[in-house]
Amino acid sequence: MKRKIFACFIVMQIITGSSIGQSTDTTIGEEYRPKAHFTPAAHWINDPNGMVYYKGVYHLFFQYYPDSTVWGPMHWGHATSPDLIHWKEQPIALYPDSLGYIFSGSAVVDYKNTSGFAKNGKIPLVAIFTHHDPKGEKEGRDNYQNQSLAYSLDE
């Protein structure tokens, strides 16, 4: 019995070992990038702010400052994955604007169109997040943070 278990173990090692060398993950050879979770290719990343699954693809949004390796005006970065292992960076999802930086939040796929944003049969992806106005904060105003919505009909 032990020999059968050992033989099965060896066969499994051979099978799985042969597929490991065929990985197309570009981060495999990058010394300082983690292999077990997403990181952008460069610059500041902060907390994850929304993960949704839509049409066979996972979408991850995260606080991101694309211009430096230190904290700065927050954006929402975007990455996609078919399997939660292999990630592809996408263009930035949300940029700072006249209302301020893009802080923490969440995202949902609005299948039932409770937001009313659907158009021509396209299902909206709705992001709910905090706008942070650094000028208002410096001035001591009490309304320097506001809740905001953004949506997309892109697929």
Indicate residue ranges for each PLM-predicted region.
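Bacterial Sec-dependent N-terminal signal peptides
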Residues: 1-24
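Beta-rich carbohydrate-recognition and catalytic domains
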Residues: 22-155
